Amino acid sequence: MHTLNNTITTTTGSQDPNLDPIPDPDQFPNRNRNQPQSRRPRGFAAAAAAASIAPTENDVNNGNIAGIGGGEGSSGGGGGGGGKGKREREKEKERTKLRERHRRAITSRMLAGLRQYGNFPLPARADMNDVIAALAREAGWSVEADGTTYRQSQQPNHVVQFPTRSIESPLSSSTLKNCAKAAIESQQHSVLRNDEKLAPVSLDSIGIAESDHPGNGRYTSVSPITSVGCLEANQLIQDVHSAEQCNDFTESFYVPVYAMLPVGIIDNFGQLVDPEGVRQELSYMKSLNVDGVVIDCWWGIVEGWNPQKYVWSGYRELFNLIRDFKLKLQVVMAFHEYGGNASGNVMISLPQWVLKIGKDNPDIFFTDREGRRSFECLNWSIDKERVLHGRTGIEVYFDFMRSFRSEFDDLFVEGLITAVEIGLGASGELKYPSFPERMGWIYPGIGEFQCYDKYSQLSLQKEAKSRGFTFWGKGPENAGQYSSHPHETVFFQERGEYDSYYGRFFLNWYSQLLIGHAENVLSLANLAFEETKIIVKIPAIYWSYKTASHAAELTAGYYNPSNRDGYSLVFETLKKYSVTVKFVCPGPQMSPNAHEEALADPEGLSWQVINAAWDKGLQIGGENAITCFDRDGCMRLIDIAKPRNHPDGYHFSFFTYRQPSPLVQGSTCFPDLDYFIKRMHGDIRDKQF
């Protein structure tokens, strides 16, 4: 004991500068050693950690944990020169982070598959514990909050609960009941002799009434029947009934369908082109029981020639026609240009006075690495820059929205206008203009970052300086061209620079610019439209989705690599403004080879985006990306809008149908469109499940 006291005294009180500043760790077995930073527990790990906090604090307070008493004194002996050890620890932390990101990437792929094909009610940020628990429950096990897992014990006088799932079976319930009774009669004696050796699941609730077997005294009372045949037959009966009930419940939902009116019905001077043709078009839509129509209100037309001079006369005439047919109306605040390979002869640019400003100051437009400008929409970096005749970008948007709200106040009061969609980027979607065909982009190219104008570069440099790394204040130089593939670039390739310190910094800043723009505009949209529903369109960027980097999503502004959920952060911002999300559903099924070449996964992307929105409590609507579809295309859209057997019964709040031309010119789609609308309304149901 005397020796031990001397040792402790020497250790805690020594101040000799000649001693080794890095003492031997074996001499101090109780010293706290640096460990890699642990991951924040989620799911069951979080519950277990919370349960263990109180005992741990008691142990500390009572001095029962080894090494607590000498911790302070021990730290004093190692205070000098540990620079090399610190660098090694930092390297080990980084290696641990890389291993963790790789593990999370594998987990995210497993979660996507389970959500898509297994109908498991997994949260968007589920971890492996949640996956194992869901699989265990599906197999009939019980899983407690602390992770304790066990088979259900015998519970007399309680009904056995079997997991329900949809099945495909040609057998009717009556046939299954007959099979069950036959199995019971043939196995009754052997089962009663051997019931103690069977599984511990209680089957007291399974009994046969005397009326089912007249004259047979054995069935005058309820008895435990543990026959395998009885179990399977009755479980099949329950599964069939549950599937029928759940399918009918899902099919009965009423999803409103809106038809998008063609773009060219309002000319560049703000006048209605063909009133009689529009009337005929609306008559066709009314005959199909369409709930309403969607019309683009183009900034480049209404405020096309002079700032703050708004021409609404053509839209007033159009809205009066829509009111005559008693159709609802959704309007789009279209702050982008229209035109391209699929637009025909219709071209709608940004306002002429904006283009004139752009000639003197081209940095008001998005710019790629080679200095080429995109005229699809205004640069988000000028949202708060007074470069538009004394107004900022968001002031221009707000003035336009406020003018519309004032001009058509009577339609809002009547309830004719049910929602307003806010255009937030290229094609009216919340995304960067990263895929311009006029600059050579070809599907499935990864696109290019749009941040090389002076305003964006100043923002990037300021952010880099605040981090203490001024040399990070520039865009990537090795991210390829518009039509490049991920593996062809240093930045997007497997374990490329996108996942380096600089890559994560840049991608976070790039995506935050998108989120910040959405927040700036939506805050003013809520002021302009008050209680009216606000809609924001989210793109479907499904190519390169099977790569680790998700390169196409990154250039479009969604920081969504395989080890990170980029959509939840966007939806958190949209949730603050009670926004309804409109998701552009992917196009028709492509050949497996085409998907493999594009590394595309439209189904996986759809499930991630839709479930991320639902997890945040957002309503979600849909829009088809194709112009005319057959019966198979209709079924795919219906399955997305009204998912079968969803545990929470979620479904789309509306659906917008885009058409290639007026219905009077595209009558070949008429029968399929009629079927599609009836299915969305729940008027007809698919009994083949």
Curated annotation (Swiss-Prot):
<feature type="active site" description="Proton acceptor">
    <location>
        <position position="623"/>
    </location>
</feature>
<comment type="similarity">
    <text>Belongs to the glycosyl hydrolase 14 family.</text>
</comment>
<feature type="compositionally biased region" description="Basic and acidic residues">
    <location>
        <begin position="85"/>
        <end position="97"/>
    </location>
</feature>
<keyword id="KW-0963">Cytoplasm</keyword>
<dbReference type="Pfam" id="PF05687">
    <property type="entry name" value="BES1_N"/>
</dbReference>
<feature type="binding site">
    <location>
        <position position="537"/>
    </location>
    <ligand>
        <name>substrate</name>
    </ligand>
</feature>
<dbReference type="InterPro" id="IPR001554">
    <property type="entry name" value="Glyco_hydro_14"/>
</dbReference>
<keyword id="KW-0378">Hydrolase</keyword>
<dbReference type="InterPro" id="IPR017853">
    <property type="entry name" value="Glycoside_hydrolase_SF"/>
</dbReference>
<dbReference type="GO" id="GO:0005634">
    <property type="term" value="C:nucleus"/>
</dbReference>
<dbReference type="InterPro" id="IPR008540">
    <property type="entry name" value="BES1_N"/>
</dbReference>
<dbReference type="Pfam" id="PF01373">
    <property type="entry name" value="Glyco_hydro_14"/>
</dbReference>
<feature type="binding site">
    <location>
        <begin position="624"/>
        <end position="625"/>
    </location>
    <ligand>
        <name>substrate</name>
    </ligand>
</feature>
<dbReference type="GO" id="GO:0048831">
    <property type="term" value="P:regulation of shoot system development"/>
</dbReference>
<feature type="region of interest" description="Disordered">
    <location>
        <begin position="1"/>
        <end position="100"/>
    </location>
</feature>
<feature type="compositionally biased region" description="Gly residues">
    <location>
        <begin position="66"/>
        <end position="83"/>
    </location>
</feature>
<feature type="active site" description="Proton donor">
    <location>
        <position position="429"/>
    </location>
</feature>
<feature type="binding site">
    <location>
        <position position="296"/>
    </location>
    <ligand>
        <name>substrate</name>
    </ligand>
</feature>
<feature type="compositionally biased region" description="Low complexity">
    <location>
        <begin position="1"/>
        <end position="12"/>
    </location>
</feature>
<feature type="binding site">
    <location>
        <position position="336"/>
    </location>
    <ligand>
        <name>substrate</name>
    </ligand>
</feature>
<dbReference type="GO" id="GO:0005737">
    <property type="term" value="C:cytoplasm"/>
</dbReference>
<keyword id="KW-0119">Carbohydrate metabolism</keyword>
<dbReference type="GO" id="GO:0003700">
    <property type="term" value="F:DNA-binding transcription factor activity"/>
</dbReference>
<protein>
    <recommendedName>
        <fullName>Beta-amylase 8</fullName>
        <ecNumber>3.2.1.2</ecNumber>
    </recommendedName>
</protein>
<feature type="compositionally biased region" description="Low complexity">
    <location>
        <begin position="27"/>
        <end position="38"/>
    </location>
</feature>
<dbReference type="GO" id="GO:0016798">
    <property type="term" value="F:hydrolase activity, acting on glycosyl bonds"/>
</dbReference>
<keyword id="KW-0326">Glycosidase</keyword>
<keyword id="KW-0624">Polysaccharide degradation</keyword>
<dbReference type="GO" id="GO:0000272">
    <property type="term" value="P:polysaccharide catabolic process"/>
</dbReference>
